[in-house]
Design a protein with these regions (language model features):
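Short helix-loop-beta junction
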Residues: 65-72, 223-235
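Intein/HINT protein-splicing elements and their conserved insertion hotspots or analogous self-processing inserts
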Residues: 1-91, 105-210, 218
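Mature N-terminal segment immediately following signal peptide/propeptide cleavage
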Residues: 210-213, 220-222, 229
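Short hydrophobic/aromatic beta-strand micro-patches
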Residues: 98-102, 214
Length: 235
């Protein structure tokens, strides 16, 4: 397993602790096998949700998986991860992926990953409480999802204020922090229902092409904000 890289984390940069050791893929064949295994899981309909581990590390991945709804959270155990440093585990930006699967599919998922030689760790489960609880050894850490979503989006808001007029940035941040993002478009037109809808990807692209559309995406921003803005405009 690749060791966790500390010096170039976004978290480390915020503390002015910047080094020259960067996360990298040391075994491209393993990376390829992992990608193909995940594609097999997707094609077989075994993945409910997924998110890459990249900028911001594991904790950012888990939070972003919760940002797009208004209910529920996660209970996470890091005890099966052999690294003791909680900061490295939560904030390291080594390439990885987090997936959610149904209990009835977990044995099939495990077999596919093991047959492909892909290492994995069961992290936790969804909960009704609106926070992420992270356990490591005797310590438990609580992360408030809605509060951290506002913090996460604040940088985009500050940039929007300089690039938009007439209070549009304030209206936008008010809408996205109060409302369930998935309610920005009709359930019948969700991506999951493309195959049953007249609104196919081709139609969407054709409609978008008729508009003067400008999508701004800051570094480390999640793409769901501009995507949801597009959906809202089309409905």
């Amino acid at each position: 397993m690749t060791s966790y890289v500390w010096e170039v984390l976004a978290f480390a940069q915020s503390l002015n602790k910047v080094g020259d050791d960067v996360p990298t893929v040391q075994n491209p064949e393993y990376f390829r096998d992992a990608f193909l295994a995940v594609q097999e899981l997707v094609n077989k309909g075994l993945i409910m949700a997924g998110h890459d581990i990249s900028a911001g590390g594991l904790i950012t991945t888990l939070l972003e998986m919760c940002f797009s709804n208004m209910e529920g959270g996660m209970e996470i155990s890091l005890n099966k991860i052999k690294e003791d440093d909680i900061i490295k585990i939560l904030f390291a930006e080594n390439p990885g992926i987090v997936i959610q699967v149904k209990n009835k599919h977990k044995e099939e998922v495990k077999k596919i990953l093991e047959d492909a030689g892909i290492g994995y760790v069961k992290l936790g489960k969804p909960t009704e409480e609106r926070h992420i609880l992270v356990e490591k050894g005797d310590a438990t850490y609580q992360f408030g999802i809605d509060y951290l979503r506002d913090v996460w989006y604040s940088t985009s808001y500050l940039l929007d204020r300089k690039q938009s007029m007439n209070g549009c940035a304030k209206k936008n941040v008010s809408r996205t922090t109060r409302n369930n993002l998935w309610n920005l478009y009709s359930t019948n037109h969700s991506p999951a229902n493309f195959h049953n809808s007249a609104l196919t990807p081709t139609v969407v692209l054709r409609q978008v092409s008729k508009r003067l559309l400008s999508v701004k995406k800051e570094p480390m921003a999640n793409a769901k904000w501009p995507i949801c803005s597009i959906w809202q405009d089309l409905m």
